[in-house]
């Protein structure tokens, strides 16, 4: 196992404040439900929890 500092979670990057309201930047997974974000890749959206993938057109 590598020694050193752990990488911090950067959940603050997934939210934005507009007009006094919190706006989510990424999509939620349709299988897992609200609270589980999908990762935004170049050609797809993918869920790290269940593996669901949506391909971009």
Swiss-Prot record:
UniProtKB keywords: Metal-binding, Ribonucleoprotein, Ribosomal protein, Zinc, Zinc-finger
Cofactor binding, note field: Binds 1 zinc ion per subunit.
Gene Ontology BP annotations: translation
Binding site for Zn(2+): 29, 32, 47, 50
Cofactor: Zn(2+)
InterPro entries reported for this sequence: Ribosomal_eS31, Ribosomal_eS31_arc, Ribosomal_eS31_euk-type_sf, Ribosomal_zn-bd
ZnF (C4-type) ranges: 29-50
UniProt keyword Methyltransferase, yes or no: no
Pfam families reported for this sequence: Ribosomal_S27 (PF01599)
Keyword Transport set for record: no
Gene Ontology cellular-component terms listed: ribonucleoprotein complex; ribosome
SUBUNIT field: Part of the 30S ribosomal subunit.
Protein name: Small ribosomal subunit protein eS31
Organism: Thermococcus kodakarensis (strain ATCC BAA-918 / JCM 12380 / KOD1)
Gene, per the UniProt record: rps27ae
């Amino acid at each position: 196992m590598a020694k050193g500092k752990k990488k911090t979670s950067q959940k603050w990057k997934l939210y934005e404040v507009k007009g006094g309201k919190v706006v989510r930047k990424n999509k939620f997974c349709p299988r897992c439900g609200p609270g589980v974000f999908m990762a935004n890749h170049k050609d797809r959206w993918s869920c790290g929890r269940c593996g669901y993938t949506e391909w971009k057109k």
